[in-house]
Swiss-Prot record:
Function, as annotated: The RuvA-RuvB-RuvC complex processes Holliday junction (HJ) DNA during genetic recombination and DNA repair, while the RuvA-RuvB complex plays an important role in the rescue of blocked DNA replication forks via replication fork reversal (RFR). RuvA specifically binds to HJ cruciform DNA, conferring on it an open structure. The RuvB hexamer acts as an ATP-dependent pump, pulling dsDNA into and through the RuvAB complex. RuvB forms 2 homohexamers on either side of HJ DNA bound by 1 or 2 RuvA tetramers; 4 subunits per hexamer contact DNA at a time.
Repeat found in the keyword field: no
GO molecular function annotation: ATP binding; ATP hydrolysis activity; four-way junction DNA binding; four-way junction helicase activity
Family: Belongs to the RuvB family.
Gene label: ruvB
Annotated spans, Small ATPAse domain (RuvB-S): 186-256
EC number: 3.6.4.-
Protein name according to UniProt: Holliday junction branch migration complex subunit RuvB
Assembly notes: Homohexamer. Forms an RuvA(8)-RuvB(12)-Holliday junction (HJ) complex. HJ DNA is sandwiched between 2 RuvA tetramers; dsDNA enters through RuvA and exits via RuvB. An RuvB hexamer assembles on each DNA strand where it exits the tetramer. Each RuvB hexamer is contacted by two RuvA subunits (via domain III) on 2 adjacent RuvB subunits; this complex drives branch migration. In the full resolvosome a probable DNA-RuvA(4)-RuvB(12)-RuvC(2) complex forms which resolves the HJ.
Catalytic class of the enzyme: hydrolase
Organism: Photobacterium profundum (strain SS9)
Length: 337
């Protein structure tokens, strides 16, 4: 099973869905819902950079997938009135790949590197002087005849995005002047996002319908927008085209997304811990084998939301299903763990 197979995964279902997602993304901070602390700070930092007519300081954005790191990077570029170049850590295989991007930037432009924790060490070393001194050190030739030349770069803003801030090396992390963590969204903020997206798509939707999707979206805008598109399909084919609470509930139940936003993989993981390992603790290797899933997928995709919502604990001895997990499935809570 791969993440893209899940309706509530954080990858895009299709190229069309990705195009729609980009179309409904907010373009400016005024349209950016939720993350109030991030929005407030970025407004100040951007205005200060504009007053000084400087490039914004380098920005690191981290947090779980689907919370809007790419959206925020594009908003920063729009607010600064500059262009943005987008790439990702795995794509930058050689130092020359990075050099080609840096030398084509205009003054104060934004270079956005997604999955920046996956940069190769050699490429990362080239990035250090570029970030710190706006200079590019290039080696010409090989062996004893090799020599280093320096190329001046225009001032620019590097925006790095990662779901694994702890995987960044200290030298790279320390070169970011601004660090922002994106948190899971509140239900009210997600409801506003769903309503805004529905308006962008020209859909008829009642507030209760938006609330139903927000409650099942796992605190994640990307999932909320995906649920909206699938509920729209259901409303147009089975209903009268209007997304009300009842229509949203029936559509989401049909899609096997329950009231807590769990799908069959979430339930499979929790029930495996409860039924096969007596509630835990269970090690990651055993859990992965029990549910037939990759360890990285469990750690990066399945567990974060379950832990954040209090259904799962990650301890030194292994994973433990909490009392809340037992209650979710209508099971008796064991007397002793």
């Amino acid at each position: 099973m791969i993440e893209a197979d899940r309706l509530i995964s954080n990858s895009f279902e299709s190229r069309d869905d990705e195009v729609i997602d980009r179309a409904i993304r907010p373009k400016l901070l005024n349209d950016y819902q939720g993350q109030d602390h991030v929005r407030g700070q970025m407004e100040i930092f951007i205005k200060a950079a504009q007053l000084r007519e400087e490039a914004l300081d380098h920005l690191l954005i981290f947090g779980p997938p689907g919370l809007g790191k790419t959206t925020l990077a594009n908003i920063v570029a729009n607010e600064m009135g500059v262009s943005i170049r987008t790439t990702s850590g795995p794509v930058l295989e050689k130092a020359g790949d990075l050099a080609a991007l840096l030398t084509n930037l205009e003054p104060n432009d934004v270079l956005f590197i997604d999955e920046i924790h996956r940069l190769s060490p050699h490429v990362e070393e080239v990035l250090y002087p570029a970030m710190e001194d706006y200079q590019l050190d290039i080696m010409i030739g090989e062996g004893p005849a090799a020599r280093s030349i320096k190329i001046d770069l225009p001032p620019f803003t590097l925006i790095g995005a990662t779901t694994r801030a702890g995987s960044l090396t200290s030298p790279l992390r320390d070169r970011f002047g601004i660090t922002q963590r994106l948190e899971y969204y509140k239900v009210d903020d997600l409801k506003d996002i769903v309503q805004r997206s529905a308006n962008c798509l020209g859909l008829s939707m009642e507030e209760e319908g938006a609330l139903e999707m927000a409650q099942r979206a796992r605190g994640t805008p990307r999932i909320a927008n995906r649920l909206l598109r699938r509920v729209r399909d259901y409303a147009e084919v089975v209903g009268n085209g209007i997304i009300c609470s009842d229509t949203a509930k029936k559509a989401l139940d049909m899609l096997d997304v329950d009231s807590s936003g769990f799908d069959y993989m979430d339930r499979k993981l929790l029930l495996a811990i409860i039924d096969k390992f007596m509630g835990g603790p269970v090690g990651l290797d055993n859990l992965a084998a029990a549910i037939g899933e990759e360890k990285d997928t469990i750690e990066d995709v399945l567990e974060p939301y379950l832990i954040q919502q209090g259904f799962l604990q990650r301890t030194p001895r292994g994973r433990i299903a909490t009392h809340r997990a037992y209650l979710h499935f209508g099971l008796d809570i064991p007397e002793a763990r």
